[in-house]
Amino acid sequence: MNNYNKIWEIILNELSKIYSDEVFKETFSNIKKINQIEEKIIISVETEFIKNKIYKMYFEKIKKITKLKFEEKIIIEFVSEKNKKNSNFDDEKKHFENLKEKLENENQTYFSKIENNENNDEFQNNKYFETIEKEQIETKTDNDKNVEIENRKISFNKYNYGNTNPKYSFDNFVVGKSNNFAFKIAKKIAEEKKVTTNPLYIFGKAGIGKTHLIQAIGNHILKKTHSSKKVLYVKADGFIEEFTNQLRKAKMEDFNEKYRDIDLLLVDDIQIMAGATRTQMEFFKLFDYLYLNQKQIVITSDKQASELKNIMSRLTSRFEAGLMVDIQSPDFNHRLNILKKKILEFEPQNPLKIKKDVLDLIASSFVNNVREMEGALLRLLNYAQTFGYDIDINIANEALELLIKSKKSVSYDEDVLEKIKSVVSNFFNISVRDLMSKKRQQKYTLPRHIAMYLIKELKDIPYNIVGSFFKRNHSAVFKAYQKIKKNSQSDYELKKSLELILKKINS
């Protein structure tokens, strides 16, 4: 056999042509020691986690490279540093002899076409090649397998896998013209055995069903596989917070183990990552890792990838390389169907009968946001149930008076509000998340007050409604508005900033 260090160098060189630098270095820079027992090369890595990851993600490709590059039989085995210290050399040698005997009795078969090898000339000239195994040669003991199964059970509890809300399913998603394509694609992904569409990027305004659809994918897969798949749902702000906390506590190994040892990642409201540069860099590494290992990624946003602001281009380009599907605001008939479905869910055993004029009132009053419309219906149903009323148009007007009045009098354009928040954040070089937060440093409070002022000034929205956007009360918004209005008359820099921001908003 050739020098075993040289053999490993050749294997590493081929792996570096297949995987990105970041993925390659993160995994294979942790090699601690290389030993040899006859035809077997034993490679020691830093932790049990890295060892398991190599077996799960890279071992098949390592075996293919070994078979292609070397005429003699070579067996590669990975052990963690701790396990290697505790191993007995004689036992290891005996295990090797048993493995060797098994190897010589194996039937030969053929691998399918080699993947991911455009830059490798030798791979290009060898489109098909033999493998020495009919099934993967076992290099783990029964005890190792039992530990792995037990660890998988523990990780489900430790990392809260399968955390989707069970109320969201494909069965209770009301399909219409505005969301039919997105629905069909989502269901196709949930039912496929192999990953063929990656990533799936679903975009549309707030409150029109993106969260329902993304979680329905996860729930369908969990139900189909009896929860054996590792599905993880996370809102972008939750990802930011978790990454920041784990980084501060120096627990990034736990973070990586949680997010990389999964089968399906569901990320809601990716636009919230705007301006969070370090988090974006970490998400980029995670995205590439999952993508290269053929793990499904599904993302939602309030806008298409090309319109995302303060999100690094190498992320948006990856989103655009997948399948982008949009969900539009539902038309009138679609909204009526949604209301009827919700009524059935409210009292499934004894469905309420609500007259068409009542449903028409709700459907015509809440046009752009299904979530708001469902909230109005729920208020009406509970109002009538609490007071023992039969639901008619008069009771509906009475129960929903304030909600309908605010919708008619405000009639605000949600896109304009989002644009104001985005422009102000960009102008002051902070994230939208920080703008909407409760941080009290001057660099956050001034932009926040300006955003409140502009929303009130430009759209003439009541203080309490503006406050609801920022999770503040009427008084806080009133004070912010008065402060900016007064100071802009004497503070030249503030006045100039307002003019520049307004110019960007109107452009």
From Swiss-Prot:
Kindly give the Pfam families that the UniProt entry links to this protein. Answer: Bac_DnaA (PF00308), Bac_DnaA_C (PF08299), DnaA_N (PF11638)
Arranged from A to Z, the UniProt key words for this protein are: ATP-binding, Cytoplasm, DNA replication, DNA-binding, Lipid-binding, Nucleotide-binding
**GO biological process terms, semicolon-separated:** DNA replication initiation; regulation of DNA replication
Question: By its UniProt entry, which SMART domains does this protein fall under?
Answer: AAA, Bac_DnaA_C
Give compartment(s). Cytoplasm
From the UniProt entry, list the residue stretches annotated as the region Domain I, interacts with DnaA modulators. 1-72
A Gene Ontology molecular function term of the record: DNA replication origin binding
What InterPro entries does this protein's entry cite? AAA+_ATPase, Chromosome_initiator_DnaA, Chromosome_initiator_DnaA-like, DnaA_C, DnaA_dom, DnaA_N_dom, DnaA_N_sf, P-loop_NTPase
> Region Domain IV, binds dsDNA: start and end of each range?
385-507
The source's superkingdom equals: Bacteria
Ranges for the region named Domain II are 72-162
The UniProt record gives the binding positions of ATP as G207, G209, K210, T211
Record's Gene Ontology CC terms?
cytoplasm; plasma membrane
Q: Where is this region: Domain III, AAA+ region?
A: 163-384
Q: Look up keyword Aminoacyl-tRNA synthetase and say if it applies.
A: no
Report the record's disulfide bonds: none
Entry's free-text remark on domains: Domain I is involved in oligomerization and binding regulators, domain II is flexibile and of varying length in different bacteria, domain III forms the AAA+ region, while domain IV binds dsDNA.
Q: What is this protein's function?
A: Plays an essential role in the initiation and regulation of chromosomal replication. ATP-DnaA binds to the origin of replication (oriC) to initiate formation of the DNA replication initiation complex once per cell cycle. Binds the DnaA box (a 9 base pair repeat at the origin) and separates the double-stranded (ds)DNA. Forms a right-handed helical filament on oriC DNA; dsDNA binds to the exterior of the filament while single-stranded (ss)DNA is stabiized in the filament's interior.
Q: What protein family does this chain belong to? A: Belongs to the DnaA family.
Subunit-structure text: Oligomerizes as a right-handed, spiral filament on DNA at oriC.
Query: What name does this protein carry?
Result: Chromosomal replication initiator protein DnaA
